[in-house]
């Protein structure tokens, strides 16, 4: 029997780590050395964006200090590494790298048959209220990159041009909400991922399931059915229920404690909803409904 490889393709700031930790605690899939190895993303860039792969290696990846960080990564090496992370008492291993949501459809189509030959691959993507999720991510970047001297190693900027860019952003946008609104006006795939495009790209795999964060924390039974493993409850997360700056301080989620630097007003939420109407429409066209929690302002 093949081990399970459970791949989660984003979206960040949607309780991805509590999702992975729940699957670990319930004896389904081990997280391996880390929940986010970013191996597939680095491999993708090595093949399709070699110049940026070198930049990513020099400024981020090689500084992570883990056993899986290899400059000459291959898909074969990824397979062997993930198999080595399967532990007794678990059905398989998970890869919850949020960068999986940034892989191109071409690359995903290329690796799908290779991975499915070696693993029983299950793919999820977890999505949260689009307006609130976008603010949490953009606010977190604003917080960590405009005050980069006081961050942990994972947020350190090692590129002088990038440092200047964020210094200029701080000068232009005095707080996180003003910067967030500027990004809503010209949405990038990184800050505002199109959920449907991510789902379509990963649908080349045989087993794919979109997880709505608010729904699964209310009732995980549909998730249990998809993975074929009983999940009776989800671990606590910072974003459910939504509490903005008053979210709980869960020890292993310290990066998310202060992701929301400010509380969004009703007017802010309405503006965000209008700006992201295209995302809601795409979701409705694909899935035939909008989660009621996403319309709460």
PLM feature spans:
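PAPS-dependent sulfotransferase catalytic core
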Residues: 1-91, 95-97, 136, 141-169, 225-286
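PAPS-dependent sulfotransferase catalytic domain
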Residues: 72-86, 147-225, 272-282
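Surface-exposed cleft-lining segments at the edges of enzyme active sites
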Residues: 64-65, 95-102, 175-191, 260-268
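Conserved phosphate-donor/acceptor-positioning beta-strand/loop module used by diverse small-molecule
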Residues: 117-137, 214-216
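PAPS/PAP-binding and catalytic site of the sulfotransferase fold
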Residues: 15-26, 107-113, 137-140, 188-189, ...
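ATP-dependent NMP and nucleoside kinases share a basic, alpha-helical "lid"
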Residues: 103-125
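Acidic-and-aromatic substrate-binding clefts and catalytic sites of carbohydrate-active enzymes
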Residues: 66-73, 100-106, 214-218
């Amino acid at each position: 029997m093949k081990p399970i490889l459970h791949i989660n393709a984003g979206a960040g700031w949607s309780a991805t780590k509590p999702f992975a930790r729940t699957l670990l605690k319930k004896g389904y899939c081990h997280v391996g050395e880390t929940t986010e190895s970013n191996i597939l993303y680095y491999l993708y860039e090595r093949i399709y964006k070699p110049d940026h792969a070198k930049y990513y290696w020099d400024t981020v990846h090689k500084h992570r200090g883990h056993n899986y960080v290899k400059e000459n990564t291959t898909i074969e090496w990824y397979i062997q590494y993930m198999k080595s992370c399967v532990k007794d008492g678990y059905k398989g291993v998970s890869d919850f790298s949020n960068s999986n949501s940034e892989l191109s459809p071409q690359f995903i189509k290329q690796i799908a048959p290779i991975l499915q030959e070696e693993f029983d691959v299950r793919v999820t993507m977890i999505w949260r209220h689009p307006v609130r999720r976008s603010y949490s991510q953009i606010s977190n970047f604003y917080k960590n990159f405009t005050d980069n001297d006081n961050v942990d190693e994972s947020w350190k900027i090692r590129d002088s041009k990038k440092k200047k860019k964020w210094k200029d952003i701080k000068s232009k946008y005095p707080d996180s909400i003003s910067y967030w609104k500027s990004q809503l006006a010209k949405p990038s795939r990184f800050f505002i991922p199109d959920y449907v495009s991510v789902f379509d790209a990963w649908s080349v795999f045989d087993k794919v399931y979109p997880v709505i964060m608010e729904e699964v924390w209310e009732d995980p039974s549909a998730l249990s059915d998809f993975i074929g493993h009983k999940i009776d409850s989800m671990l606590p997360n910072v974003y459910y229920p939504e509490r903005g700056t008053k979210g709980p301080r869960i020890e292993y989620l310290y990066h998310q404690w202060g992701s929301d630097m400010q509380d969004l007003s009703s007017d802010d939420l309405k503006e965000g909803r209008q700006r992201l109407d295209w995302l809601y429409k795409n979701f409705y066209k694909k899935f035939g409904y909008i989660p009621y929690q996403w319309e709460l302002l």
